[in-house]
Amino acid sequence: MKKGLLFILLAAASVCLPAQEKENAAKSYTVETNRFGANWFISGGIGAQMYFGDNDGKADFGKRLAPALDIAVGKWFTPGIGLRLAYNGLQAKGAAPSADARYAKGGTYSNGYYKQKWNMANFHGDVLLNLSNMLCGYNEDRIYSFIPYVGAGLAVSWSEPREKNLGINAGLINRFRLSPALDLNVELRGLLMKNAFGGASKEGMGGVTVGVTYKFKKRGWNAVPTVPMVPESQLNDM
């Protein structure tokens, strides 16, 4: 856990290095907190996801990949901290030893295990941390931003038998600036559940999606110059 956190911090800090000299020469400033209606965004992405649970190793890697869809709406409250409500899901695939298992579709793999397939959704809320802005300072023209997140929500299956379970979410958004209004996102995400779909004591879902984010107006942050403090003794001498 500590090694993983250290890796994230080092990776985020590394994106600051090329612009460090430029930022050191820039005028010192802070940013104003905008109104509640500012810095809202909507994002969407498509990709692939994989279920991890009982007998998941009984199917080949490619056979376990399922289509994935991401949709999210959120707001940045500061350049470094944001919240979002998100949907992830579409479909999941697995393997079962019996034709009577949940979501078994009748067909079999070459090893005799039955194919599983079900429609699912994961509704969750996340806390977003833009480490590029937090560690390197706010820069509205930054091309790449490193944004890990963590959250919780409810995972459900739309296929019979319908199941639902609380889940913990975590992931990483690699954000590439396309324009003041649009970003390209490459998102790596994970979901951890307890005995939700396949009967395992712990189950999970991992996915990778590519998509875009549209940022509504008013977007960005207003810079406020930082006024240096002058000691009272110097003021008296003036």
Give the ranges of each region predicted by the language model.
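Cleavable N-terminal export/targeting peptides
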Residues: M1-T33, R219-M238
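Gram-negative (and chloroplast) outer-membrane scaffold detector with strong preference
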Residues: P79-L166
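Residues that define the transmembrane beta-barrel architecture of outer-membrane proteins
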Residues: A38, K63-P67, N119-F123, Y144, ...
